[in-house]
């Protein structure tokens, strides 16, 4: 497909405001699903739009299935994030603009570029299919894939494959083809301080009884030492091959050269392979509403990112034990567990990935990078659990350098889409 055709198709998709988290855009999500269904139907694939109870519309499709051939499932998602503050956008998020080799618009990189990639891969191979191809274009990834387990259970035959290519990751830098090998897991919970007293004047109780925020602050401070190292006992780390991130590049991603980082031997390992705890929110009186009272109640939500191989049940137990062991002054504190999810390891030494890296290295101008993702992709866990024998491959056309996924001024490098199409086509031919 010529670059102008890629731009035309991606632009048509970006114009559809398929924001899955906003009930006012449910019709747009339906429109987006129908657009995708028409794309693959026009290629002659067997296609359908499917919703499970409480879910958003997804598109599944497949070529004619030959039992003598390997089967590859190509995944992407057609829903997008909200746009946030429009004043921070340089262009209309749903009126795509091409500038300096990039297409700007909400969903351009995350993840409508993935749909464009898969469409063109199928189109290139259709006349002489080296493998069976199945398509799965989800409609609720941006809200955490809440019905994915039910969807897989009800549509297992439509999704089962030898290889699952998820085009919802991306490239560590512009022009650097990248394979994602790990995703961190996650547990989170709430620390709740509830001192058995009523709010009292600080002139009456101050200095005699600890207020709730003092208690909460001491617990939060116990999570890290002076070097910023996590102090929760019993957690592990994962040992995997990853490409080292430069400090200057990380600061560029963070948006400031002035921010101070923790001292660490390896930024990549710290970010992708080790546990990390953050305080997400605190409930306590607002500064503007403050009065001279000793407050009895305060709470904080904490998030613990897990190494890819860490058991989330074990991690939640270790987190709770740490909180309860570090309660100061015999205060009244409880820990309320919340969500948890496993990490993912995608072995880069398996056959399809090995062949894909060979294709990357012959088509792109730079050698392939191997990265982890510090966050989670919830549906990836469902695939790993339900299809344990399938090879999982995490790639994408987006980039972490200028892509701005989920942020204002999201964009995608157009030649990344071209080269990813070419790389996947070459790989699919070679593995047959």
Language model features by range: what are they?
Residues 1-86, 297-301, 314:
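N-terminal helical capping/dimerization or prosegment-like subdomains
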Residues 50-53, 107-111, 370-375:
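Active-site nucleophile and cofactor-binding loops and adjacent substrate-binding regions
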Residues 69-137, 403, 415, 419:
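Active-site metal-coordination/substrate-binding segment of hydrolases
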Residues 78-79, 223, 227, 321-330:
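A common structural junction motif
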Residues 108-258, 268-275, 386, 408-419:
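Fold-level recognition of mixed alpha/beta catalytic cores in primary-metabolism enzymes, strongest
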Residues 109, 197, 304-311, 341:
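A generic structural motif
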Residues 173-174, 231-289, 293-297, 309-318, ...:
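An extended, acidic, His-containing surface patch that forms the Zn2+-binding/catalytic region
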């Amino acid at each position: 497909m010529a670059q102008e055709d890629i731009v035309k198709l991606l632009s048509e998709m970006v114009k559809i405001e398929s924001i899955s988290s906003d009930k006012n855009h449910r019709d747009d999500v339906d429109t987006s699903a129908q657009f995708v269904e028409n794309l693959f139907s026009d290629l002659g694939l067997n296609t359908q739009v499917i919703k499970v109870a409480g879910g958003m519309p997804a598109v599944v499709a497949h070529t004619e299935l030959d039992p003598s051939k390997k089967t590859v499932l190509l995944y992407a998602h057609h829903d997008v994030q909200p746009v946030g503050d429009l004043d921070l956008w340089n262009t209309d998020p749903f009126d795509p603009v091409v500038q300096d080799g990039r297409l700007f618009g909400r969903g351009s990189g995350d993840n409508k570029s993935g749909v464009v990639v898969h469409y063109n891969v199928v189109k290139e191979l259709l006349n002489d299919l080296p493998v069976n191809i199945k398509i799965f274009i989800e409609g609720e990834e941006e809200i955490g894939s809440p019905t994915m387990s039910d969807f897989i259970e009800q549509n297992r035959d439509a999704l089962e494959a030898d290889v699952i290519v998820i085009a919802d990751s991306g490239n560590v830098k512009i022009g650097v083809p990248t394979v994602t090998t790990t995703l961190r897991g996650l547990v989170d919970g709430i620390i709740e301080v509830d001192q058995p007293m009523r709010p009292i004047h600080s002139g009456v109780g101050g200095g005699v009884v600890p207020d709730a925020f003092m208690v909460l602050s001491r617990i939060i401070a116990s999570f890290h030492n002076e070097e910023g190292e996590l102090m929760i006992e019993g957690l592990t780390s994962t040992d995997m091959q990853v490409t080292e991130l430069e400090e200057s590049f990380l600061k560029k991603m963070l948006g400031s050269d002035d921010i101070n980082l923790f001292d660490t031997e390896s930024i990549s390992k710290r970010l992708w392979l080790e546990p990390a705890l953050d305080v997400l929110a605190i409930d306590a009186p607002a500064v503007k509403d403050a009065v001279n009272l000793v407050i009895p109640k305060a709470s904080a939500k904490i998030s613990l990112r897990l190494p890819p191989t860490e058991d989330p049940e074990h991690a939640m137990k270790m987190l709770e034990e740490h909180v309860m062991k570090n309660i100061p002054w015999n205060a009244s504190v409880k820990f309320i567990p919340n969500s948890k999810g496993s990490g993912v390891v995608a072995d880069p030494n398996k056959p399809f990935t090995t062949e894909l890296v060979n294709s990357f290295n012959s088509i792109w101008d730079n050698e392939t990078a191997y990265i982890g993702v510090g966050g989670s992709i919830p549906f990836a866990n469902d695939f790993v659990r339900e299809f344990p024998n399938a090879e999982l491959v995490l790639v994408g056309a987006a980039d972490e350098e200028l892509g701005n996924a989920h942020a204002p001024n999201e964009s995608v490098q157009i030649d990344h889409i071209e080269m990813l199409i070419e790389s996947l086509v070459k790989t699919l031919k070679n593995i047959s």
